[in-house]
């Protein structure tokens, strides 16, 4: 059998390794100059006014919601078709997640469904940029402005994505992820981008115990006067070991995303006559980051269900993924919201399959996946 082909693998090279070695030898390995470099470089790359590095996108979402005062009695509108951490953070703050349906073919929310879910208790809207494509931000921003509700963009999949002539993260408040499978990775990490001065200052405090400065600032400035806790906060800062990797990855992002684009194009060309159904790309102007390449496996079209197809791929040494099982179908939320029915979300949740896509893949790897799919589906195809 050929070597196992995972659905994702981080593109880590000698530059990232050397950056970590330099930090380890610097005498300062926690939050420090590499964090500052990452935040500065991110703002320069994407036109952000403020960038605040954190230990994960989940942490970033948590303290952003906190900074906006989200709490008991509040409602936050977001899709169920997302990683469950966003829903968890809303619930842990005592607020109510109002989960809405998605477009069947792009997996993203539309403004009409968001508007229909707004009540007097709505305190935030969290759309998700999916698989590397952007939401229709103009329509969403118009709704948010009309009702004076904060918009928090979940861009865990969308570093290097453009909406029209703007980068995702250039305007408003946006949460990015640097998790191991993301387009930029530092193993674990995230970043909050915002053009709101007050929000930026607040999340910077909340990420580090509620202090006005971090440990590196206090070392440089000395400990007199002693830094004070302005408000209770968390330990969500990013170490410089992680930040150093992200700095290099950010420099490499154009080549990383270009390779992802080429691989996605090869998949699309090869699957044009397949009963598998790739996600649609939005019809508005955008630049896709191709974080994931996803297909829908419909048994009526393919003669085999998604789970069986994934098992067969594994048997021939090919990994695949599920991004994601809808949040409201998870045990806790299924029991909490037993009557919630989101048709497009549920249809996709039962059929989504993520195929291998990462920068170090060869064209022949794509061909191997496509050939395996044809072999598996061939005898079953309806």
From Swiss-Prot:
Q: What is the recorded name of this protein?
A: UDP-4-amino-4-deoxy-L-arabinose--oxoglutarate aminotransferase
Query: What InterPro entries does the entry give?
Result: ArnB_NH2Trfase, DegT/StrS_aminotransferase, PyrdxlP-dep_Trfase, PyrdxlP-dep_Trfase_major, PyrdxlP-dep_Trfase_small
What's the encoding gene here?
arnB
Report the pathway entry: Nucleotide-sugar biosynthesis; UDP-4-deoxy-4-formamido-beta-L-arabinose biosynthesis; UDP-4-deoxy-4-formamido-beta-L-arabinose from UDP-alpha-D-glucuronate: step 2/3; Bacterial outer membrane biogenesis; lipopolysaccharide biosynthesis
The catalytic activity of this protein is classed by the Enzyme Commission as 2.6.1.87
MF-aspect GO terms: pyridoxal phosphate binding; UDP-4-amino-4-deoxy-L-arabinose aminotransferase
Reactions catalysed, as given in the entry: UDP-4-amino-4-deoxy-beta-L-arabinose + 2-oxoglutarate = UDP-beta-L-threo-pentopyranos-4-ulose + L-glutamate
Q: Which GO terms describe its cellular component?
A: membrane
Is the Transferase keyword given for this protein?
Answer: yes
Provide the GO biological process annotations.
Answer: lipid A biosynthetic process; lipopolysaccharide biosynthetic process; response to antibiotic
């Amino acid at each position: 059998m050929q070597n196992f082909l995972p659905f994702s693998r981080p593109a880590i090279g000698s530059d990232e390794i050397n950056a970590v070695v330099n930090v380890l030898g610097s005498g300062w390995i926690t939050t420090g100059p590499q964090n500052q470099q990452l935040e500065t470089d991110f703002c320069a790359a994407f036109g952000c006014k403020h960038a605040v590095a954190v230990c994960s996108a989940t942490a970033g979402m948590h303290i952003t919601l906190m900074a906006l005062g989200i709490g008991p009695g509040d409602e936050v509108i977001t899709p169920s078709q997302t990683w469950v951490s966003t829903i968890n953070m809303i619930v842990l703050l005592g607020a109510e997640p109002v989960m809405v349906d998605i477009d069947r073919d792009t997996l993203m929310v539309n403004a009409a469904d968001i508007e229909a879910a707004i009540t007097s208790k709505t305190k935030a809207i969290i759309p998700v940029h999916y698989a590397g494509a952007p939401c229709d931000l103009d329509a969403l921003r118009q709704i948010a402005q009309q009702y004076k509700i904060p918009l928090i963009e979940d861009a865990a999949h969308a570093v290097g994505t453009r909406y029209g002539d703007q980068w995702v993260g250039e305007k408003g408040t946006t949460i990015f992820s640097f998790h191991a499978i993301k387009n930029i990775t530092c193993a674990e990490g995230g970043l909050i981008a915002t053009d709101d001065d007050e929000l930026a200052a607040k999340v910077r405090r909340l990420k580090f115990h509620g202090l006005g400065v971090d440990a590196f600032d206090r070392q440089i400035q000395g400990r007199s006067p002693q830094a004070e806790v302005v408000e209770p906060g968390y330990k969500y800062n990013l170490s410089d070991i992680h930040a150093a990797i992200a700095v290099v990855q950010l420099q490499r992002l154009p080549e990383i995303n270009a390779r992802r684009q080429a691989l996605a194009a090869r998949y699309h060309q090869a699957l044009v006559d397949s009963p598998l159904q790739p996600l649609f790309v939005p019809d508005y102007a955008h630049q896709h980051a191709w974080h994931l390449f996803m297909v829908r496996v419909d048994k009526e079209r393919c003669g085999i269900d998604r789970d069986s197809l994934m098992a067969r791929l594994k048997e021939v040494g090919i990994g695949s993924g599920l991004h994601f099982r809808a949040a409201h179908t998870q045990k806790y939320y299924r029991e909490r919201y037993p009557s919630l029915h989101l048709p497009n979300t549920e249809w996709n949740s039962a059929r989504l399959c993520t195929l291998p896509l990462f920068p170090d893949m060869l064209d022949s790897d794509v061909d191997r996946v496509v050939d395996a799919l044809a072999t598996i589906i061939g005898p079953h195809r309806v």
